[in-house]
């Protein structure tokens, strides 16, 4: 103590040479038999598991764990996402593991939302769509039963002050080629009012100060609008099947 002031709520610690025993527990890991494939390993448990442990193989020096997917037999939607800051369609085309590992998820629908980063590189519409088309074809080649939906870029400005005509051209090409290339389209640029609505969207609190990225409310609004459009299309699909 440096003074005789002891205030309410404080803890006084007195050093002592005494010791206190602590109980320890030993965990035993039971290896599971994996079903290997070229780019993944699967394990199906007959009973529900509440925990698993990942233990490195001591016999292998170099290895990579690219992902872990936990599933059950309950009905519902299984949603996966991949988002890399600054990513463009050309980036996904560079790394073959993206297409090689995607079948592990057995996707029914793959949604692609790219374009804003390409616009800051000032990619021409033709260059952008060539890269996008390569990405789509790579996905379909490895996942022939999966549907592909391309989402256009939301409204944005270039370098805080210029009209982003690049994403407008990208949206045109995405819509014009949808039927020929056999993919679905959701025009977020149009649904969000186009580039002329940037001031209005910003006033609503949907956009960040750079007028490129969106706020939490803005991204949630995009998700809400997409979900409504998706369900509406699904209900229309069901009605035509009856």
What label would you give each PLM region?
Residues 1-130, 213:
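Conserved SGNH/GDSL esterase-like catalytic core that processes O-acyl groups on lipids
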Residues 15, 83, 152, 189-192:
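Residues at the C-termini of beta-strands that transition into short coil/loop
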Residues 38-40, 96, 134, 169-171, ...:
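Residue-level detector of functional hotspots within protein domains
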Residues 97, 131-135, 225:
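Well-ordered alpha-helical segments embedded in enzymatic catalytic cores
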Residues 100-101, 138, 229:
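A generic secondary-structure signal
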Residues 106-119, 126-142, 147-190, 219:
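Conserved N-terminal glycine/acidic-rich loop preference
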Residues 155-242:
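Catalytic His-Asp segment of secreted/periplasmic serine-dependent ester chemistry enzymes
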